[in-house]
């Protein structure tokens, strides 16, 4: 692996997005709380506070970041479903990762992630095809269709889980 930042590669997807792709991505989002929990199973405090790469976040920060990011995504979906192409508020994820709550036990975020994903997945499975075409506008990256955002956040969960599993493999944990 050449770039530890992208252990599964950067987000890409085939066009056109099919219903099968959407179903797979929603399943990956649904599976994330269990996959992330498995990835950190039996890690001690020192391991949780180990960066996944030089200059990168610690395992603990990665876990908390996933919840921060997915909470924002859930809100973005709800905005896109109830408003016409809303402009969403970006956040400084690197600064959020330095806030005091990023030092909390990872179980706090794992419980949040499980509950959040139950609600989010319920919402995602309720979407009609026309809902997948709805968009939100990110001031830095532009307009994003919900269909693409589902894939992006499925990838995002696998991406950060792989940060942890690849670290464990490299260090024989």
UniProtKB/Swiss-Prot annotation:
Domain of life: Bacteria
Function: Possible metal-dependent hydrolase.
Family: Belongs to the metal hydrolase YfiT family.
Cofactor remark from the record: Binds 1 zinc ion per subunit.
Pfam family, one: DinB_2
SUBUNIT field: Homodimer.
Chain residues that bind Zn(2+): 65, 156, 160
Disulfide bridge positions per record: none
Protein name: Putative metal-dependent hydrolase BCE_2729
InterPro entries: DinB-like, DinB/YfiT-like, Put_metal_dep_hydrolase_YfiT
Cofactor: Zn(2+)
Enzyme Commission number(s) from the entry: 3.-.-.-
Entry's Gene Ontology cellular component terms: cytoplasm
Gene3D superfamilies to which the protein is assigned, alphabetical: dinb family like domain
């Amino acid at each position: 692996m050449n770039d530890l930042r992208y252990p599964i590669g950067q987000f890409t997807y085939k066009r056109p997005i099919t219903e099968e792709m959407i179903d797979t991505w929603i399943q990956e989002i649904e599976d994330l709380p269990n996959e992330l929990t498995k990835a950190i199973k039996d890690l001690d405090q020192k391991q949780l506070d180990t960066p996944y790469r030089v200059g990168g976040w610690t395992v603990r920060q990665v876990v908390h970041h996933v919840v921060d990011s997915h909470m924002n995504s859930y809100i973005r979906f709800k905005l896109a479903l109830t408003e016409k192409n809303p402009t969403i508020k970006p956040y400084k994820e690197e600064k959020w990762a330095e806030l005091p709550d990023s030092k909390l036990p990872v179980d706090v975020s794992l419980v949040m992630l499980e509950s959040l994903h139950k609600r989010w997945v319920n919402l995602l499975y309720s979407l009609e095809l026309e809902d997948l075409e709805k968009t939100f506008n990110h001031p830095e990256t532009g307009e994003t269709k919900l269909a693409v955002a589902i894939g992006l956040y499925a990838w995002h969960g696998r991406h950060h889980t792989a940060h942890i599993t690849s670290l464990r493999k490299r260090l024989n944990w």
